[in-house]
Amino acid sequence: MKNICLLGATGSIGEQTLDVIKAHDDKFRLTAMTFGKNAEKAAEIIETFKPKYVGVGDEHTYETLKQHSFSYTFKTGIGEEALIEAAVIPEADIVVNALVGSVGLLPTLKAMEHKKTIALANKETLVTAGHIVKEHAQKYDVPLLPVDSEHSAIFQALQGENPKHIKRLIVTASGGSFRDRTRRELEGVTVEEALNHPNWSMGAKITIDSATMMNKGLEVIEAHWLFDLPYDQIDVLLHKESIIHSMVEFHDRSVIAQLGTPDMRVPIQYALSHPERLPFNEAKSLDLWEVGQLNFAQADFERFRCLQFAYESGKIGGTMPTVLNAANEEAVAAFLSGRISFLGIEDIIEKALERHQVIAKPSLQEIREVDKDARKFVQTLLT
């Protein structure tokens, strides 16, 4: 039995992780969980899975949760401290980081210090502090298992392979909600249109990131850290069906791809069960006859400027990816609240990157300060 700590239980990845735990309740137990503001959903999860510890986003949500009557007692915590308390709970074997944003960094590092296996769905952890996370993983000798479908695909393709034989990684991308539109057609698109992803069921922020292709850019930076490869050995390929989740090309020109129907529960389960493979009858089997054909196209930097920003930031390194991520988070929030246009997201990110003075090898404190400063700068652009 593996005991799971789930950070971000009420989000999209969190819910799908709970599906996996429920499907294999003889293999997995939810020991600790955190959530942000959705007290109603959290109350259902608590009563169903009965975790020993529950972290709540803020005081107001905590007061709302207290109004529910539960059939058992459990420990609680509030705010960022609760994220860390949950991540280091002695009973947990695996910490699933399903948080959105850079708030996921510190709990990951603390969990590593307590020898927890990390199942990472929080992109920002590696994007903002990849060098620190990798150092921690090596220092404390803890596995860092990818949950993203693309990185899981690469991870699976590399099982039993010598990393020295890799020629390149090919990260596939659906292209998001607006993959068939020109830049001119993107002017004036609505939030509702942007949130209508053709293939995947995801949260609002990641769905917008998918539409701008920033999501793929962040995944490229993640892949750089996860698989220790330079950026010129990581390619992005548009593949609208989302059937091939990613590929690895080796020096002998062989290519290994991982395929499957788009269902995030499959890579989540692989991260939880690794090195085992468990059955998962909830997922639909891949029927290539039914799919009929697979389509591919080049990822154009001029069309997808956020992808270009990510490659450039990754190559520069240091604190540049931190600024990229912080500016993107603030810009996406502004778009979702109707304060800027869809293309305005790119403009804000570009301005934040242009003004930044890079720190080559930042400490954790410097990363936090740069993150805060970048967000403040974006807010000045929005007022």
UniProtKB/Swiss-Prot annotation:
InterPro entries: DXP_reductoisomerase, DXP_reductoisomerase_C, DXP_reductoisomerase_N, DXPR_C, DXPR_C_sf, NAD(P)-bd_dom_sf. SUPFAM superfamilies: 1-deoxy-D-xylulose-5-phosphate reductoisomerase, C-terminal domain, Glyceraldehyde-3-phosphate dehydrogenase-like, C-terminal domain, NAD(P)-binding Rossmann-fold domains. The keyword Ubl conjugation does not apply. Mn(2+) binds at D148, E150, E219. It is an enzyme of class 1 (oxidoreductase). Transmembrane segments: none annotated. It catalyses: 2-C-methyl-D-erythritol 4-phosphate + NADP(+) = 1-deoxy-D-xylulose 5-phosphate + NADPH + H(+). The keyword NADP applies. GO terms for biological process: isopentenyl diphosphate biosynthetic process, methylerythritol 4-phosphate pathway involved in terpenoid biosynthetic process. Its cofactor is Mg(2+); Mn(2+). Belongs to the DXR family. Catalyzes the NADPH-dependent rearrangement and reduction of 1-deoxy-D-xylulose-5-phosphate (DXP) to 2-C-methyl-D-erythritol 4-phosphate (MEP). This is 1-deoxy-D-xylulose 5-phosphate reductoisomerase. It comes from Bacillus licheniformis (strain ATCC 14580 / DSM 13 / JCM 2505 / CCUG 7422 / NBRC 12200 / NCIMB 9375 / NCTC 10341 / NRRL NRS-1264 / Gibson 46). The gene is dxr.
